């Protein structure tokens, strides 16, 4: 019986208790939660449901808890339900109900943990979307790892996810990029507002190789040639880097297409027609404060050029026209203002602002030998995704980016993430899977098979703790999806690995020497198989490998 199963049983029991006494069943929350007590002596799970609803039905919490406990203990799978404190319920499962968790994992296999909370929902997940003016830096690396993991998690809950990269090939940064390439081709320093670094020189050399005549072209044609070829070369490099990192996209959407197709102009005219734009100081402004933004936003500047938000507005319209129910944007720490403006733009078109979600990620810092490693894209000393992977590998790079909440900054200690010890979180989790794989191989060599028919024999404390931890996994995946928080799965996997290592230290899994195999050995092998499956499932959602040996 998983926590979700128990919560469902608990709600049904509480509803029956209230109905039998003529009390209002509607006061019960739609879904209940049960928690694992900090002290295992208090039981397997605890709930405060009696304290939540007692006052609403005119009784006291302990009395209501007593009614629920009496009814609950009569249910299959419940060993005991005891009242504690002001009205808590501490619940123990019987051994068969605990063992059923292991059976459910073995039966579900790679689908264990999947759900349907987002079934049929069309979700556009836009992430990375780095400017094609340089390699992907650490901030983009974080979004690549987190975004890809989130896409996997949303899909595991039934979401129809489209991973999208918004290719910023329109605007002043592209002009600065092309001028920087021309300067490099001439052997001159980069423009003051341009980009520098070895990659600029490399791309400039590639342009010269493809178009030996480029330096003889008129200035405007020359810049356009450097722009077109340079941007394509840079974007090809970005896509290859992401692919090597395990990240691929379903759609690469070109910002410039919004302007060339007239979509931006059409969106602006539509807003003018609806009265959601006003003219002031020679510019056109969106009345975004009418829709909850902290200030009105310039859409068309006084020089007649479109502000960046104009493209954002047209892009959102494009997404909705493609039938997406939810548009998730993953943006950097300097984009807080985009939350209000994107939601306001949606509302201005008569759309539901809740179709827009914006996740803001914080900074990533690199530390080596206790000293921060500085980065600056424009100075040409940027720390890139490729640099990080070269230093600590793909798995560690993805894991370190995912395991922290996106609203907190990360300090990546290169010394820590290259350790082959329990101090390194990804090693700790992967080692648990590798150890379990070794046990499976050794059992096969002994001709010993797992048997889930006698799981009630698993009575050691560490066995019960491991089983209960396995049972938490579906709820963790559901929470990670609904809260858009992939780090919950990484932290859970560390908890599961810890529970497994403690079990391994306390229980002999395979017979030793001339010892005969017993039903306990076979039951423990079943528990090991279930643990291995859950570790593999969780690592797959993070895009991290589950090694068979280390």
Curated annotation (Swiss-Prot):
Output the superkingdom of the source species.
Answer: Bacteria
Which PROSITE patterns is this protein grouped with? AA_TRNA_LIGASE_I (PS00178)
Tell me which UniProt keywords the record has, alphabetically: Aminoacyl-tRNA synthetase, ATP-binding, Cytoplasm, Ligase, Nucleotide-binding, Protein biosynthesis
Any GO BP annotation:
arginyl-tRNA aminoacylation
Motif 'HIGH' region per UniProt: ranges:
130-140
Q: Which InterPro entries match?
A: aa-tRNA-synth_I_CS, Arg-tRNA-ligase, Arg-tRNA-synth_N, Arg-tRNA-synth_N_sf, ArgRS_core, DALR_anticod-bd, Rossmann-like_a/b/a_fold, tRNAsynth_Ia_anticodon-bd
The cysteines covalently paired via disulfide bonds are none
**Where would one find coiled-coil regions in this protein?**
none
Pfam families linked to this entry? Arg_tRNA_synt_N, DALR_1, tRNA-synt_1d
GO molecular function of the protein, one example?
arginine-tRNA ligase activity
In the UniProt record, which is one GO cellular component term?
Answer: cytoplasm
Q: What is its EC number?
A: 6.1.1.19
List the catalytic activities from the record. tRNA(Arg) + L-arginine + ATP = L-arginyl-tRNA(Arg) + AMP + diphosphate
From the Swiss-Prot or TrEMBL record, state where the protein is found: Cytoplasm
Show the NCBIfam families listed in the entry: argS (TIGR00456)
Q: How does it assemble?
A: Monomer.
* Annotated family: Belongs to the class-I aminoacyl-tRNA synthetase family.
Q: What is this protein called?
A: Arginine--tRNA ligase
**Which organism is the protein's source?**
Rhodococcus erythropolis (strain PR4 / NBRC 100887)
